Amino acid sequence: MLVRNLKYLSYELSRRLEARLWYSHVHYNHHDRRFELFFGGFGKRCDKPLEIYVSHAHNTWKDSSMTVQLVLNDEVLDSVVIYPGEKFPEHWFESLCSTLGLIRDSDIL
């Protein structure tokens, strides 16, 4: 479930952000049990990455709730908890895109 939701998150962000940001890479932090998705400015090196942390509550991904946080310069801008069987809430995507719309390019480049 987590992997499927993570792929959905990446797809939805790419689609909704209309190439304002490009997806840089994903890293799995085993110690904190979280994925770290890094984004940057399109066509530019990412000096101050926009990060999306996706952490899960248990050792296994199946039937595990997830916490998703939008982080810029170590400040949490938005977060949501997604429970097993849920899709990413539509209102969170709207909130995320609205938050990203307030971020100036100079904040992330």
Spans of model-derived segments:
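Generic hydrophobic/packing signal
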Residues: L72-D74, L100, R104
